[in-house]
């Protein structure tokens, strides 16, 4: 069991249950999954971009990414249906907690001029979305081997009923918000 998973079970769950005044521990919000997505529009012209992104994402997440293909053709973008334009990974259970631990304690402190994430990036249903502009903030990526700086979107899906509950959950995980 990972460090954050034990912390959730032993410290966060009882504290959040008391704070939100819930009788059953199964009602308490928890993180369901983390989805990491890389949109690679530049992969249309250069296939090496897609291969390096797949390799880097597998290093960051610890599992093999899924290649996302274009759903429809768009002539102005020179895009055809079925062309690979991105990759994504969905993390659950053990790998999810390990990734969240590395994200909060290692990757986020390495971001230049970081002042905290916006607390307004919740979607209204208790899920949080954020973007990271450089994949080199993760310690797993070797800076010398990076051919192109790529960003990624990270979606944290929770079982919370509201944004306030989800924010309380993420704050207890020591997630850095502005203000």
UniProtKB/Swiss-Prot annotation:
GO molecular function: rRNA binding; structural constituent of ribosome; tRNA binding
Matching PROSITE patterns: RIBOSOMAL_L5
GO CC terms, sorted: ribonucleoprotein complex; ribosome
Record's keyword annotation contains tRNA-binding: yes
BP terms from Gene Ontology: translation
UniProt keyword annotations, A-Z: Ribonucleoprotein, Ribosomal protein, RNA-binding, rRNA-binding, tRNA-binding
The keyword Isomerase appears for this protein: no
Subunit architecture: Part of the 50S ribosomal subunit; part of the 5S rRNA/L5/L18/L25 subcomplex. Contacts the 5S rRNA and the P site tRNA. Forms a bridge to the 30S subunit in the 70S ribosome.
Family: Belongs to the universal ribosomal protein uL5 family.
Stated role: This is one of the proteins that bind and probably mediate the attachment of the 5S RNA into the large ribosomal subunit, where it forms part of the central protuberance. In the 70S ribosome it contacts protein S13 of the 30S subunit (bridge B1b), connecting the 2 subunits; this bridge is implicated in subunit movement. Contacts the P site tRNA; the 5S rRNA and some of its associated proteins might help stabilize positioning of ribosome-bound tRNAs.
Protein name per the record: Large ribosomal subunit protein uL5
Organism: Ruthia magnifica subsp. Calyptogena magnifica
Gene assigned in the entry: rplE
């Amino acid at each position: 069991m990972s460090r954050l998973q034990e912390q959730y079970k032993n410290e966060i769950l009882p504290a959040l249950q008391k704070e939100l005044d819930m009788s059953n521990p199964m009602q308490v919000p928890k993180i369901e999954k983390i989805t990491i997505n890389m949109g690679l529009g530049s992969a249309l012209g250069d296939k090496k971009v897609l291969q390096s992104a797949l390799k880097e994402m597998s290093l960051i997440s610890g599992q093999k990414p899924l290649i996302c293909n274009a759903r429809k053709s768009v002539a102005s973008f020179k895009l055809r249906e079925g062309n690979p334009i991105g990759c994504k990974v969905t993390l659950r259970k053990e790998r999810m907690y390990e990734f969240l631990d590395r994200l909060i304690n290692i990757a986020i402190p390495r971001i230049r001029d970081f002042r905290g994430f916006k607390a307004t990036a919740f979607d209204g249903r208790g899920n949080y979305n954020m973007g990271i502009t450089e994949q080199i903030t993760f310690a797993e990526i070797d800076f010398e081997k990076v051919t192109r700086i790529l960003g990624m979107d990270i979606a944290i899906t929770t079982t919370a009923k509201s944004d306030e509950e989800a924010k309380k959950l993420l704050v207890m995980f020591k997630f850095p918000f502005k203000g």
